[in-house]
Amino acid sequence: AITTYIFPLLRITSVFVLAATSWAFAAIKKPIVNSTSKKDLKYFRTLHSLAFTELGMKKSNVMQDEHYEDIGRKLGIEVTVYSNGEEKTGFVDSDSEYFNIINAARIKGITIEEEYNTDMYSQDIDKHMLQILKDEVDNYKYSYKLVDFTDMIEKFNVAELCPKYDVIFVDEAQDLSPIQWKMYDILKKNSKHVILAGDDDQAIYGWAGADVARFQSEPAKDIILPQSYRIPGAVQDIANCILNRIPDHRRIKKQWSPRPEKGYVEYVTSIEDLPLYS
């Protein structure tokens, strides 16, 4: 996909390549970094990075792990945040369901109560503490003039500070959350051409608010890439065993060929047998 679609686009002076998360961005940037000039790489961003830049923000404006932990201490909520000040999924990566519920609600554009009622969380949550925590977070950010990653997208969507582009290319679009889809709509309005790259079968960020249904229903000319250069046959067989159980109305059916080599799949019966730290 990169060779077929992105490299030709680099000849256009006004093209922006965007990714839903920093992990997706790293994957798309790697094969390109040696094939283009450094000045062109400024056109390769995550959605959060684009919002951050267009809003004229500085890193000192961004909520860090210690800020969330400070708020937790004030309210007697034990929390550890693992982002190291970097956006990976657009989601606050913490061990606190309180922070996760609040952020998920904002990303999805729903109320805290609606997110709480999704049955994704434990029964130990004090429902009344959720609003108290949200108010404390808002007050903390206001007092210290800080923003979080969700604020960046929200502020971009309100201000619509979007340059004009000939083409935007959005990678891993199946992982866009409702708030990111709103940002995409603004980008689309300010671009002559839009390419969405993604695969609903690879949607793994539902827990972080990914709106796969929006990706599936987006009006566009569908192009199914017929050949994978990454997946061997044995892995495709396992994947198809799972995917074929999904009702037709829940996914986009597609035909594609795996790599020539068959490969192999190992079955591991215990997590203790996985070399997680090697």
What are the residue ranges of the model-derived segments?
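Low-acidity, Ser/Thr- and Arg-rich intrinsically disordered low-complexity segments
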Residues: 2-5, 11-14
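Short active-site oxyanion
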Residues: 13-16, 41
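Short, intrinsically disordered, charge-balanced linker/junction segments flanking boundaries
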Residues: 14, 104-105, 116, 270-278
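Accessory N-terminal region flanking or inserted into the helicase ATPase core
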Residues: 81-169, 178-183, 206
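Conserved P-loop NTPase-based nucleic-acid remodeling module centered on helicase motor cores
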Residues: 28-101
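Short beta-strand-centered segment that lines the nucleotide-binding/catalytic pocket of NTP-utilizing
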Residues: 17-21
